[in-house]
């Protein structure tokens, strides 16, 4: 089997680890298109190694710099720009599977385009299903497109369901709890971006690392699981599991529970999504269960981590609210990373956006984009108002 792939977000954490998987594939995975946001220098280095047919960049100026550098090196690889450019990379005829590894709701358009083009989707961009889960899954069914999860938790559930009777009792999503899982509510008001970026277990990009620290990431994953596995919110539970060894669990109607275990290494679910239904040998470190300390689980504290409850509330409400919640969170997280607001301002801004939004029950894609844009404007205004920036 040779699979031809496009990687949207190739210079990010998931994108770089996807290329590590490609490197070990012995030619069974080939890169046809690479896309990034603004890091044209790293994308140039990747192009020199993997020689894709097409390159895409979100930012126009970065695309111009990349095109100039490619011309100077005698590499006749076309460069396209913007969201339309990402969609063009995703829809390239020579591509079999699209790895959507971009961060944020910007992944929605290219993912939908890839689905309409009949491409298999290796989904690492959870915001796509958060913002437009019903529309995305309906399009995938209509086009008979397979969506394979890359998130470790959803990959774990997907693996546990293979060959099983689908009469489920519940899904159990595990969360490391992030770097602040044992901090008091008072202490959370003082944490800095540098504190939040020190994740104890996983190697991830900055936005998702902050979401992990606030437990917003787990709330987004609850919504993603609802749509990927067609299960009610009442049947999805979140447990804090500090060791990050059990990646998620499935409880069946008879009370049996299956789990998928392994070291916290994103290359494993990435490879599984790209090679499914096969399993390829790896040379990466493996879990030695005899050397593993006790595995512990506890329920999350929603008072200290209100973002989790906000996300689940948005998911239960549905309609346009998940897109608003997600967009407001993106703005707030980037403001926190820039030291413009405090950590606990993130859920405050998200809550205010959700409360102010004029809800739509069944938005189409343009309406979802409008809700997203409104929430970004609203959250941006709130960033400049009353805040508790850490010293």
Curated annotation (Swiss-Prot):
| Ligand binding (Mn(2+)) | 151, 153, 221
* UniProt record, GO biological process: isopentenyl diphosphate biosynthetic process, methylerythritol 4-phosphate pathway involved in terpenoid biosynthetic process
Alphabetical UniProt keywords: Isoprene biosynthesis, Manganese, Metal-binding, NADP, Oxidoreductase
Quote the Pfam families the UniProt record gives. DXP_redisom_C, DXP_reductoisom, DXPR_C
Q: What is its EC number?
A: 1.1.1.267
Per its record, the protein catalyses: 2-C-methyl-D-erythritol 4-phosphate + NADP(+) = 1-deoxy-D-xylulose 5-phosphate + NADPH + H(+)
What is the official name of this protein in its record? 1-deoxy-D-xylulose 5-phosphate reductoisomerase
- Pathways involved: Isoprenoid biosynthesis; isopentenyl diphosphate biosynthesis via DXP pathway; isopentenyl diphosphate from 1-deoxy-D-xylulose 5-phosphate: step 1/6
- UniProt binding sites for 1-deoxy-D-xylulose 5-phosphate: 126, 152-153, 176, 199, 212, 217-218, 221
**Family named by the database record:** Belongs to the DXR family.
Biological function: Catalyzes the NADPH-dependent rearrangement and reduction of 1-deoxy-D-xylulose-5-phosphate (DXP) to 2-C-methyl-D-erythritol 4-phosphate (MEP).
Q: What HAMAP family does UniProt report for this protein, alphabetically?
A: DXP_reductoisom
Please give one Gene Ontology molecular function term for this protein: manganese ion binding
Q: Which cofactor does it need?
A: Mg(2+); Mn(2+)
Enumerate the residues binding NADPH: 11-14, 37, 39, 125, 127, 205
């Amino acid at each position: 089997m040779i699979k031809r792939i496009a990687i949207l977000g190739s210079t990010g954490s998931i994108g770089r680890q996807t290329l590590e998987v490609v490197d070990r594939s012995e030619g069974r995975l080939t890169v046809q298109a690479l896309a990034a946001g603004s890091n044209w220098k790293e994308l140039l280095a990747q192009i020199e190694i993997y020689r894709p047919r097409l390159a895409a960049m979100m930012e126009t100026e970065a695309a111009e710099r990349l095109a100039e550098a490619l011309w100077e090196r005698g590499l006749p690889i076309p460069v396209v720009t913007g969201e339309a450019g990402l969609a063009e990379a995703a829809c390239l005829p020579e591509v079999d599977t699209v790895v959507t590894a971009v961060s944020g709701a910007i992944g929605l358009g290219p993912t939908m385009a890839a689905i309409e083009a009949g491409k298999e989707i290796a989904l690492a961009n959870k915001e796509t299903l958060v913002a437009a889960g019903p529309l995305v899954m309906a399009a995938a069914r209509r086009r008979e497109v397979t969506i394979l999860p890359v998130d470790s938790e959803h990959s774990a559930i997907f693996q546990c369901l293979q060959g099983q009777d689908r009469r489920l009792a519940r899904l159990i999503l595990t969360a490391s709890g992030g770097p602040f899982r044992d901090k008091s509510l008072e202490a959370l008001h003082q944490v800095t971006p540098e504190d939040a970026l020190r994740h104890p277990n996983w190697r991830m990009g900055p936005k998702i690392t902050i979401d992990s620290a606030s437990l917003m990431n787990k709330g987004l994953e609850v919504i993603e699981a609802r749509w990927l596995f067609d299960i009610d919110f009442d049947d999805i539970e979140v447990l804090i599991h500090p060791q990050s060894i059990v990646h998620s669990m499935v409880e069946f109607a008879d009370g049996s529970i299956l789990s998928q275990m392994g070291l916290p290494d994103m290359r494993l679910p990435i490879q599984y999504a790209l090679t499914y239904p096969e399993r390829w040998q790896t040379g990466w470190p493996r879990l030695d269960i005899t050397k593993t300390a006790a595995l512990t689980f506890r329920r999350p504290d929603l008072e200290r981590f209100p973002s989790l409850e906000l996300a689940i509330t948005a998911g239960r409400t549905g309609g346009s609210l998940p897109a608003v919640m997600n967009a407001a969170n993106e703005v707030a997280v980037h403001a926190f990373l820039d030291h413009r607001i405090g950590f606990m301002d993130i859920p405050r801004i998200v809550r205010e956006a959700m409360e102010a939004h004029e809800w739509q029950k069944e938005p189409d894609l343009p309406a979802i984009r409008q809700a997203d844009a409104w929430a970004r404007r609203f959250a941006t205004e709130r960033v400049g108002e009353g805040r508790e920036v850490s010293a």
